[in-house]
Amino acid sequence: MNRRNLLKTLTLSLGATVISSDLLAKVDENTYSFKTPQNPLLKPLDKAVTAITLGAGNRGMVYGDFAKNSPKELKIVGVAEPIPFRNERYSNIHSIPKKNRFDTWEDVFKRPKFADAIIISTPDYLHYEPCMKALELGYDILLEKPIAPTEQECRDILALAKKKNRIVAVCHVLRYAPYFIKMKELIAKGAIGEVVSVQHFEPVEHTHMA
């Protein structure tokens, strides 16, 4: 399996989690875990995909955990994070050399391409510019939702990804969570009859991501 196929299926192995009150204190250690069923499409790689993480906060740590737990599939080789303790923590976890530690995402792209992919887990308003720059340099991208703040920016990303023949995999990870897999299965089987209306909300408490 090559790196493109991994990026296409990577989100099957990743998931966000609803954090209960008794786990909130452990967020900094990122000790909670969300397990999804093994993806049958995931095949062994010839070598691990190398990636640079932009943003080493909560979501950057989640993808970092995947790399730590699946070293044959993903290796983190660089990080951009402006908060010093997060930068140092992430670098130490993944044994990132000093030359590949950056304070800003802009600094990453001052270097020639030195990894297969970029993981963009920056704040929502900082998705568009790093994504466009990464595409220009030939990186494949794992992009946290939302893609970008405006429709036009989303269209710009799509157009450049097609032009450069690069992957932009958007992290709608809950699509593959056991909760939604089971819901789809029950509806498809007709277990609750014919579905004529759906009201959906995210079942999280008020402290979620506060």
Predicted regions and their residues:
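N-terminal secretory signal peptides and thylakoid transit peptides that target proteins
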Residues: M1-L14
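N-terminal Rossmann-like dinucleotide-binding module
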Residues: S13-S95
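Hydrophobic residues in well-ordered beta-strands that form the structural core
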Residues: T53, I120, L143, P149, ...
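Alpha-helical structural signal in soluble globular domains
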Residues: F66, S70, I93, K133, ...
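Short, well-ordered coil/turn segments that N-cap beta-strands
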Residues: L74, D116, Y139, R166-I167, ...
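Short, Asp-centered acidic motifs that coordinate Mg2+ and/or phosphate
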Residues: G78, A117, S197
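Beta-loop-alpha module in the N-terminal Rossmann-like domain of NAD(P)-dependent dehydrogenases
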Residues: K99-D156, L160
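Predominantly a Rossmann-like dinucleotide-binding segment in NAD(P)-dependent oxidoreductases
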Residues: I167, L174-A210
